[in-house]
């Protein structure tokens, strides 16, 4: 299937089948061959053809990154485009869900009271989280709520959502009138320009819950007038105060001139339904928005007694105004493209770090030699070291070196000396350093700080290198003698063909090939200095972002010198 075009990491996913199509593109189910998880990959093509579509996509992927909740669909990954400047499609990887609530309602006419309660509980729990972030979904409907066979629901499609900020007006131009009218609150009927509040989502949840109870839409209006007729047939004629909140002049005049209607008892409209469920539904469908409960208040309703504990339900911190600055200023397609690229990098942390540091090398995405070597050695480690190290194909790379791991039990008869490593300098912009653990406080507890240095049986004592990265805390050398010894060892034990890494990063590239010691983790902790404690099984050097990659070790759980960017997956 020609699905990924020229995207470089497409081999990570094994496409299964097409599960959806639309004007935006196509959705396929797939297997993530790195994790074994089933995923849904949404290919959105020509995203910059229309600026409004691109802004909607940016809004959705940004909100789904910021709103992490069990009842909101999760973006697991966004594939890197082959070019920072010229990409047109994006591939968003979601967790795979079986179906949506619309299909569940249509296919099941025997949903139980427990189903009804659990479905509403999950929707309100997600809504509470969304609203505490000052986000309004604005397009809640059964098709935008995904479902699994185990009755798990997740809200999706935040393309029409908006974030409200305390210092800005909440009145916005309602550009997306094509959103489904059936689930739209009465104060929005016919309005292209409206002030909105969280109550619009509460109304939508009420309409969805009524559809779950009956199996059919509650207010399937053919137009605005018909929609208002259906609402008032059930709820009765609203008060003049409620009518005044409707911004559309024609809708307001129509309701004001309407004959008086009495509300229909919900017990007649919804027979054989739990009375507590009907009381809550009536609150959710209050015509006046100020009479509707918040999601948090609805979760505290007696209907959820024994199921929900409001104080236990998670809330979200309000979203920063800077995240949605693009909503309040005029932007070009290039601006939106750069912002979408920035969002994609959120799923590739090392590239994001380089991007934020101002590195121009973020245009180099793949496939690089660094990535290929990293992927090969990851496979070797996953296979338990059953196959040997791969042959190097570039003469500038160091030869393969085996660094023993702590899996070899130390001989109790050998001398042990507590040692720590020297602090590795912080990387400059455009360069990366492996995960060094700062050890500014020697008294702080650190599970990686205690080390036992045991004789490496693979290196003869005569070849021992007094490396600057493995100091003996009780050395008898003077500073001058010590430096002379280091220089002598460096000349003696670093052959000419292996000097490339020292030239690239002379201050940070450790020589671990001839060390007679390896670290163990069993010894008790002794005196420590304020130097950095570096985990023995994760030694990192640094090099320019697009520099030469050097990797050591062909076996499982061995130490490695890793150059370039960190693992992107």
From Swiss-Prot:
Source organism, top-level taxon: Eukaryota
Catalytic activity, reaction form: L-seryl-[protein] + ATP = O-phospho-L-seryl-[protein] + ADP + H(+); L-threonyl-[protein] + ATP = O-phospho-L-threonyl-[protein] + ADP + H(+)
UniProt-listed Enzyme Commission number(s): 2.7.11.24
SUPFAM superfamilies reported for this sequence: Protein kinase-like (PK-like)
Modified positions (Phosphothreonine) in chain numbering: 175
Modification sites for Phosphotyrosine: 177
Binding positions for ATP per the UniProt entry: 19-27, 42
GO molecular function: ATP binding; MAP kinase activity; protein serine kinase activity; protein serine/threonine kinase activity
Region (Disordered): 401-420
Cellular component GO terms held in the UniProt record: cytoplasm; nucleus
Gene: MPK7
CDD domains xref list: STKc_TDY_MAPK
Post-translational modification: Dually phosphorylated on Thr-175 and Tyr-177, which activates the enzyme.
Name the record gives this protein: Mitogen-activated protein kinase 7
Domain comment, as recorded: The TXY motif contains the threonine and tyrosine residues whose phosphorylation activates the MAP kinases.
Induction: By jasmonic acid (JA) and infection with rice blast fungus (M.grisea).
GO process annotations (BP): intracellular signal transduction
Motif (TXY): 175-177
Active site: 139 (proton acceptor)
């Amino acid at each position: 299937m020609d699905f990924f075009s020229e995207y470089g990491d497409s081999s990570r996913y094994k496409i299964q089948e097409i599960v959806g199509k639309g004007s935006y593109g196509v959705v396929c189910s797939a297997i993530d061959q790195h994790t074994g998880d089933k995923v849904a990959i949404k290919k959105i093509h020509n995203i910059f053809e229309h600026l409004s579509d691109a802004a909607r996509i940016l809004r959705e992927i940004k909100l789904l990154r910021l709103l992490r909740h069990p009842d909101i669909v999760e973006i697991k990954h966004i594939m890197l485009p082959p070019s920072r400047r010229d990409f047109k499609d994006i591939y968003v990887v979601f967790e795979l869900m079986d179906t949506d609530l619309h299909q569940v309602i249509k296919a099941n006419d025997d949903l139980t009271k427990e189903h009804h309660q659990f479905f509403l509980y999950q929707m309100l729990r997600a809504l509470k989280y969304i609203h505490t972030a000052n986000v309004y979904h604005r397009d809640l409907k059964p098709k935008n709520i995904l479902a699994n066979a185990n009755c798990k629901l997740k809200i999706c499609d935040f393309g029409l959502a908006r974030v409200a900020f305390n210092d800005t007006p909440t009145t916005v131009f309602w550009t997306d009138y094509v959103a489904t009218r059936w689930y739209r609150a009465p104060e929005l009927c016919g309005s292209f320009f409206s002030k909105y509040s969280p109550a619009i989502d509460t109304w939508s949840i009420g309409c969805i819950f009524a559809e779950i109870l009956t199996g059919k839409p509650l207010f399937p209006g053919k137009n605005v007038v018909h929609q208002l007729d259906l609402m008032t047939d059930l709820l009765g004629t609203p008060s003049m105060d409620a009518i005044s909140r409707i911004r559309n002049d024609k809708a307001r005049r129509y309701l004001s001139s309407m004959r008086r209607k009495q509300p229909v008892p919900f017990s007649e409209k919804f027979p054989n339904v739990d009375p507590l469920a009907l009381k809550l539904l009536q609150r959710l469908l209050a015509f006046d928005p100020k009479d509707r409960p918040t999601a948090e208040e609805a979760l505290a309703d007696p209907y959820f007694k024994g199921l929900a504990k409001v104080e236990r339900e998670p809330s979200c911190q309000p979203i920063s105004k800077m995240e949605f600055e693009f909503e309040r200023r005029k932007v070009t397609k290039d601006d939106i493209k750069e912002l979408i690229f920035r969002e994609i990098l959120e799923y590739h942390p090392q590239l994001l770090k380089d991007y934020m540091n101002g590195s121009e090398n973020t245009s180099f995405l793949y496939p690089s030699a660094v990535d290929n070597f990293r992927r090969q050695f990851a496979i070797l480690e996953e296979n338990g070291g059953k196959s040997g190290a791969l042959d190097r194909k570039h003469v500038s790379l160091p030869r393969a070196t085996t660094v023993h791991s702590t899996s070899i039990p130390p001989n109790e008869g050998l001398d042990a000396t507590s040692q720590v490593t020297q602090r590795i300098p912080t990387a400059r912009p455009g360069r990366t350093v492996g995960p060094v653990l700062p050890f500014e406080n020697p008294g702080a507890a650190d599970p990686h700080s205690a080390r036992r240095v045991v004789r490496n049986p693979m290196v003869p004592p005569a070849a021992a290198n007094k490396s600057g990265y493995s100091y003996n805390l009780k050395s008898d050398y003077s500073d001058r003698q010590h430096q002379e010894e280091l220089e002598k060892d460096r000349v003696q034990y670093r052959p000419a063909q292996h000097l490339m890494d020292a030239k690239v990063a002379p201050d940070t590239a450790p020589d671990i090939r001839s060390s007679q010691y390896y670290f163990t983790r069993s010894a008790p902790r002794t005196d420590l200095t304020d130097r950095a404690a570096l985990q023995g099984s994760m030694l990192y050097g640094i090099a320019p972002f697009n520099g030469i990659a050097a990797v050591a070790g062909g076996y499982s759980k061995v130490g490695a010198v890793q150059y370039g960017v960190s693992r992107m997956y």
